Swiss-Prot record:
Homodimer. This is Serine hydroxymethyltransferase. The lineage of its organism: Bacteria, Bacillati, Chloroflexota, Chloroflexia, Chloroflexales. Catalyzes the reversible interconversion of serine and glycine with tetrahydrofolate (THF) serving as the one-carbon carrier. This reaction serves as the major source of one-carbon groups required for the biosynthesis of purines, thymidylate, methionine, and other important biomolecules. Also exhibits THF-independent aldolase activity toward beta-hydroxyamino acids, producing glycine and aldehydes, via a retro-aldol mechanism. Its main location: cytoplasm. The modification N6-(pyridoxal phosphate)lysine is found at residue 227. It catalyses: (6R)-5,10-methylene-5,6,7,8-tetrahydrofolate + glycine + H2O = (6S)-5,6,7,8-tetrahydrofolate + L-serine. It comes from Chloroflexus aggregans (strain MD-66 / DSM 9485). The record marks 226 as: Plays an important role in substrate specificity. The keyword NAD does not apply. The gene is glyA.
Amino acid sequence: MLEHLRATDPIIADLIEREAQRQRQGLELIASENYTSLAVMEAQGSVLTNKYAEGLPGRRYYGGCEFVDAIEQLAIDRACQLFGTSHANVQPHSGAQANIAVFTALLQPGDTILGMRLDHGGHLTHGSPVNFSGKWYNVHFYGVDPQTGQIDYDDLAAKARAIRPKLITSGASAYPRLIDFARMRQIADEVGALLMADIAHIAGLVATGEHPSPVGHAHIITTTTHKTLRGPRGGLILMGEEFAKQINSSVFPGTQGGPLMHVIAGKAVAFGEALRPEFKQYAAQIRRNAKALAEGLHAQGLTLVSGGTDNHLMLVDLRSTGLTGAQAQRALDKAAITVNKNAIPDDPQPPMKTSGIRIGTPAVTTRGMREREMAQIAAWIGEVLMYPDDEVRLARIAAEVAEMCRHFPVPADMVQVR
């Protein structure tokens, strides 16, 4: 493996090998990360990286597109089948690019949007002032109820009536509960707004019925193709006939040039994998593992925002431990447990410190771990957070983590295991 790269650029080859070792020997609990299959990686590493294909299948600006046309059409058809929509655009390079395309298709600069507060679990592209969405549009925010930690739909409705937004965004990057897309569509209809559902984190759960679907409620749906969907890093837009032409034009030529055909091939492979019965079993296990991990963390005396989880992630409020999210992240890194610092609702700490950490189960579930392993992981996390400066203890836990991981190979190692 990597023999050509090692001969051409041994420095990069060595860094890739070291990253592979990190993934192999550590627990990946970042909620937005996962492991793609070898098939997806092979598609991404193929000769398709050499091909330009501006336009859509059958309507290209370049010759020689007969095979990439077939690949992209397969990706489109499989995405529509997977989510139950009539139209899909598989070209966005990322979830952020998908959101940019939707905003530029449906809005004019200065239009009003209503999105979820970033520190309440939303996403940068839903109106954060440091993002294009917060710079180009008049943004107002909704959030979670301080008592329950869950979306306050009554407050959302009141704000929508007051500001009459042109677009309401639903979806989040750090929200552990189910989203009521039907209620959000009712609110949108009441004020004449469009509803965009960003399901980047929960797409794999939505596709398998493990989370209510926004299809039939949202006018437009965006997502990434990695995370719980377990494909390559990229974006996807789902819609009906009403918005298809606008969205397609907004992706190209509006916000992008040539699509990444090697990534689109990887998306097609991942969508095909997600259509198989075993993927439904995988998605169900993600939620079971998340529930077990949340219960284990609670048993360790840790506080969870909203009290638990309904999906693939949980948010730990660290204020009772005296640690910031950044401190907890560093200590867990030393124990070979990877999480990310994350804001909690109304967080008093700045974004690079935070008062919380976000934890998710998609990657460890891909490795085959189940509820028993979640109980052990919770115990390790509890111990690290209790003794974050005990280097000997952290090294011991890292060794124990590596031993557990040895029994649950990442996809890149499965060929050797077989």
